[in-house]
Amino acid sequence: MKVASIFLLTALVLMSLSGNSGANILGREAKCTNEVNGCPRIYNPVCGTDGVTYSNECLLCMENKERQTPVLIQKSGPC
């Protein structure tokens, strides 16, 4: 009984540590709006999954309109 309890506790700890770790590997989609007049000139950098730092999410969205494969946001801030 004691061995089973230790095994169960160890399994629960390992599962909680693994959690959602794979969700951030690819990145998240940019929140794109239909900017008719272009993007705002606000510097709020994001790092794309292509390794490029974009000045803001809007500029990443504009880049995605030109690409076949969309770039995701790997992290907030510069690459």
UniProtKB/Swiss-Prot annotation:
Superkingdom: Eukaryota
InterPro entries (UniProt xref): Kazal_dom, Kazal_dom_sf, Prot_inh_Kazal-m
Disulfide bonds: 32-61, 39-58, 47-79
Signal peptide boundaries: 1-23
UniProt KW Disulfide bond keyword: yes
Transmembrane annotation, as ranges: none
Site (Reactive bond for trypsin): 41-42
An annotated Gene Ontology molecular function: serine-type endopeptidase inhibitor activity
Key word Secreted present: yes
UniProt subcellular location: Secreted
Record-marked site positions (Necessary for sperm binding): 43-44
Keywords for the protein's UniProt record, in alphabetical order: Disulfide bond, Protease inhibitor, Secreted, Serine protease inhibitor, Signal
GO terms (BP aspect): negative regulation of calcium ion import; negative regulation of nitric oxide mediated signal transduction; nitric oxide mediated signal transduction; regulation of acrosome reaction; regulation of store-operated calcium entry; sperm capacitation
Pfam short name (any one): Kazal_1
Gene3D superfamilies, per the entry: 3.30.60.30
GO-annotated cellular components: extracellular space
Protein role: Serine protease inhibitor which exhibits anti-trypsin activity. In the pancreas, protects against trypsin-catalyzed premature activation of zymogens. In the male reproductive tract, binds to sperm heads where it modulates sperm capacitance by inhibiting calcium uptake and nitrogen oxide (NO) production.
PANTHER family reported for this sequence: SERINE PROTEASE INHIBITOR (PTHR21312), SERINE PROTEASE INHIBITOR KAZAL-TYPE 1 (PTHR21312:SF27)
Protein's recorded name: Serine protease inhibitor Kazal-type 1
